[in-house]
Amino acid sequence: MRRAAVLTAGSWGTVFAKVLADAGARVTLFARDRAIADAINGRHVNPRYLADVRLPDLVRATSSPERALRDADLVVLAVPSQALRSCLVEWAPLVGPGAVYVSLMKGMEAGSSRRMSEVIAQAAGVGPERIAVVSGPNLAREIAVEHPAATVVASASAATAHAVQAACWTPYLRPYTNADVLGCELGGAVKNVIALAAGMLEGMGFGTNSLASLITRGLAETARLGTALGADPMTFAGLAGLGDLVATCGSPLSRNRTFGEKLGRGMTLDQVLAEQRQVAEGVRSCRPLLALADGLGVSMPITRQVERVLYEGLPPLEAVKDLMSREPGPEYRL
């Protein structure tokens, strides 16, 4: 039986632990809060996230990373993107020599503009054949209640991708494989920024035409950056590109969209940060993404305006006006 460690017990980590167990793995979920671990072991629920969803008996929890990682052949990482490097400094020495790291994170490291798989490779000292990325339209709440969904498992190693695919294939989650790790990660990171903009539109009271235009043009700037970095353009038409973008921009379950909606209603960045418990990755990813784009001469006007709203105090309506007043041009350009 496959043994998986999932770190940590946030909403997506908890749900993915359920997925792995439903697919037949023995799972140890690391919860920093011992009370959460005790509740999972005693009542089979995570009382902080998804308290009404029963976890399988194959899911056990611990507040000890050493116990969680002992004998694990899959190490699933579900932590805030900006905390990943410091977490791996502590955890990587506890990981077995043949274990595969699986990233559930969709963000970019501030300062370095590195993708999560790059941070794992550097901080844990492992090759790309031991790293996989899971990305797609995967709102945790919907998967928790077993609404049918699909996802992508990307790895530089076909064997690794297929192994992780088999480990998370259930009657309600259908995983596909992809060799384009860069494209899958980039799609997940940029869509969080676009979802912030989608929330702003909702908060300002705009309608379906506005949202559809934003999603489509957001996909265009994602593809421009991805192509410049060497990603496969087809990736952005798939689950890790368009699929993730549609789900995150359109659902009230999306924390990035919810965050943006509050900005659109007039709250400041500091006010929303103080109110919203869960991490909105797009807030921290927009600047690293822009640094990448600027270095390559790639235009990302939506991401630029989101950054201005977040960090320069630009009113969201002014950001919309700026986007709409840009010089017209062809729809397709690289």
Curated annotation (Swiss-Prot):
Subcellular location, record wording: Cytoplasm
Keyword NADP annotated: yes
Residues bound to sn-glycerol 3-phosphate: K106, G136, K191, D244, S254, R255, N256
Keywords attached to this entry: Cytoplasm, Lipid biosynthesis, Lipid metabolism, NAD, NADP, Nucleotide-binding, Oxidoreductase, Phospholipid biosynthesis, Phospholipid metabolism
Active site per UniProt: K191
Residue runs in coiled coils: none
Enzyme category, top tier: oxidoreductase
Keyword NAD: yes
Reaction equation(s) it catalyzes: sn-glycerol 3-phosphate + NAD(+) = dihydroxyacetone phosphate + NADH + H(+); sn-glycerol 3-phosphate + NADP(+) = dihydroxyacetone phosphate + NADPH + H(+)
GO cellular component, one term: cytosol
GO MF assignments: glycerol-3-phosphate dehydrogenase [NAD(P)+] activity; NAD binding
Function: Catalyzes the reduction of the glycolytic intermediate dihydroxyacetone phosphate (DHAP) to sn-glycerol 3-phosphate (G3P), the key precursor for phospholipid synthesis.
The name this protein goes by in its record: Glycerol-3-phosphate dehydrogenase [NAD(P)+]
Species per Swiss-Prot/TrEMBL record: Parafrankia sp. (strain EAN1pec)
